[in-house]
């Protein structure tokens, strides 16, 4: 594994606790306003385009739009939190992670396995990416991040890619992070409006809360139970309420 692959595919180790990262920095970079047009989605990459078509054919419209919003939230958050790692991260690797992170909730897979949706989804994503021509390193980086995207906590480390997908999904789903009081303001109002307008929420928080309850009912051992009252946290998401 080359050092360039480590950086491009987000393998750099960071604390699993985003609060620990913030505390070590002292302050985040200055906030900037963006429109969706200001942030380039790597649609010209054939692999990304094929993965996008794959998920669009399988995910619900609500989940697809969530996945796209996550790409933009994460891009903005990364630039403020860890700009050096953000600069080196491949936009394609990030886009693939976002597009595929909830593939385990697709109807074709959600009830066809006893595995937790995030763990099965990571394995499925790796299989799909290898078939589509991804490098092994990139496919494994995406899989690792997806498998750990609900693995929030305070102890240990995670890949930068894994931390970023955690932060971006929590931003969209909950709008809050335990111990980080200003988490909602990590993305400014103008940017938040642009992203939510470009990829409408269609009642996402309520919709995905129902998905969480369904998984926890069908699979009481599932990894989603690691996040206490995740469904209720989503339904209490005041940050995104104006666009729900």
From Swiss-Prot:
CDD domains: HDc. It catalyses: urea = cyanamide + H2O. PROSITE patterns: HD (PS51831). Cyanamide hydratase involved in the detoxification and/or utilization of cyanamide, a toxic nitrile compound distributed widely in the environment. Compounds that react with thiol groups, such as Ag+, p-chloromercuribenzoate, and iodoacetamide show a strong inhibitory effect on cyanamide hydratase activity. The enzymatic activity is also sensitive to chelating agents such as EDTA or o-phenanthroline, as well as to reagents containing structural elements of cyanamide, such as urea, dicyandiamide, azide, hydroxylamine, thiocyanate, or cyanate. The keyword Transport does not apply. The lineage of its organism: Eukaryota, Fungi, Dikarya, Ascomycota, Pezizomycotina. The gene is CAH. InterPro entries: Cyanamide_hydratase_HD, HD/PDEase_dom, HD_domain. Disulfide bonds: none annotated. GO terms for biological process: cyanamide metabolic process. PANTHER family: CYANAMIDE HYDRATASE DDI2-RELATED (PTHR35569), HYDRATASE, PUTATIVE (AFU_ORTHOLOGUE AFUA_7G06270)-RELATED (PTHR35569:SF8). Gene3D superfamilies: Hypothetical protein af1432 (1.10.3210.10). This is Cyanamide hydratase. This enzyme is highly specific for cyanamide. Pfam families: HD (PF01966). Residues 63-174 form the HD domain. Optimum temperature is 55 degrees Celsius. Optimum pH is 7.7. Transgenic plants expressing CAH acquire resistance to toxic cyanamide. Moreover, due to its innate ability to convert cyanamide to urea and the broad-spectrum antimicrobial activity of cyanamide, the CAH gene can be used to facilitate plant growth promotion and biocontrol of phytopathogens.
